[in-house]
């Protein structure tokens, strides 16, 4: 019977690496510490009843390599042997996975823990700087990722080690500040009476914001797809869409600035995920950095902190692979999150 194990010993190769999001799951296999990961096609979570089926059909049936262990990054808190995902119907059951998929060792981490691991050593070719602040200090960092939800992860640098800090920062309160905000926010769809950052700063949140703007302006909303809203906004072909993406960038800047202060992220704030890349033209405009820096009495501090958009197509897998190769470089907690045969 597989048992929880708090060992910090390296996981045995070959290692299955998985980034399990609300909509898509991405997998690779790392055969040894020096090899490049073997990538597999993305898997839509809605296409499989369980994660075990997705791994079997999407990975194991397509390779002769049998992984001995797995590191999985999941969207949701990890509290026990059954790990439900926040934005999809899968439940990760490491004990069942070990018995059913022939593995010896499974480690489960938060998805933005994996994103945080990635930004420890992200090259310039895999990131785009937003704003004038520069520098690449060996100092704490933070990652925010608007996608199916809003993920937040910290990366603290201490004792010559990178320590990822998972959490549910996407669910902090987000409130109105400007006159326009006070017009719009009463029409934002709430969750149990509150507006969290994730109610606006994700795909469905973008639609939520667009619909609220339409209500305030007495316009009939014509779009229900986040991609339609962003494309019309960037083309300048729909006034409500343009304002939606502009305010999205502003609110993202506010939350990013808050997280920069929480983690004292002098090493930079990184925006990951597909939405950040798609709205890059909007993030390059002044609104994002102005909101990021508008943190009196600490405006001067925020002006020194660089902000980046992560452009690496598989950043979470890259971060997990870095940890799998050199676990001693990272302070990853395994307590309550690692199971061995």
From Swiss-Prot:
Pfam families linked: Glucokinase
Q: Indicate what this protein is called per its UniProt record.
A: Glucokinase
Transferase among the record's keywords?
A: yes
Family per record: Belongs to the bacterial glucokinase family.
- Gene Ontology terms: cellular component: cytosol
Name the source organism. Answer: Rhizobium leguminosarum bv. trifolii (strain WSM2304)
* EC assignment: 2.7.1.2
Q: What GO terms are given for molecular function?
A: ATP binding; D-glucose binding; glucokinase activity
